[in-house]
A protein has these predicted regions:
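Non-catalytic signal-transmission and effector/linker regions of two-component phosphorelay proteins
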Residues: 1-7
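Conserved sequence signature across two-component system core domains
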Residues: 11-12, 35, 53
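Active-site residues of response regulator receiver
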Residues: 12, 56, 83
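Acidic catalytic/metal-coordinating carboxylates
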Residues: 36-40, 63-66
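Conserved phosphotransfer cores of two-component systems
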Residues: 46-48, 70-77
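Receiver (REC) domain active-site loop signature in two-component systems and cognate sites
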Residues: 59
Length: 83
């Protein structure tokens, strides 16, 4: 992946973790979009083609594993799970 054109979705309910991951990725020239829950992430993947999704497993409401189960046929993007 070319970091100058790689678009990453970071999904985490913790503002601090989401901000930290975004800051690190931005400093390394990745384009980053964030979502604070699985429902917000689902809306974003409907309109944007991401190169990678970094996804928290434990979130209130729909968790990361439920997001994967419900979207695996529609999304072919690699996913990294955070715990």
């Amino acid at each position: 992946m070319d970091s100058f054109t790689t678009h990453i979705l970071v999904v985490d309910d913790d503002d601090g973790i989401r901000s930290l991951v975004k800051k690190y990725l931005n400093e390394n020239n990745y384009l980053v979009t964030t979502a604070n829950n699985a429902e917000d992430a689902e809306e974003k993947v409907k309109i944007i083609k991401f190169d990678l999704i970094i996804l928290d497993i434990m979130m209130p409401g729909k968790n990361g594993l439920q997001f994967i189960q419900e979207n695996k046929k529609r999304i072919d993007t690699p996913i990294i799970l955070l715990t």
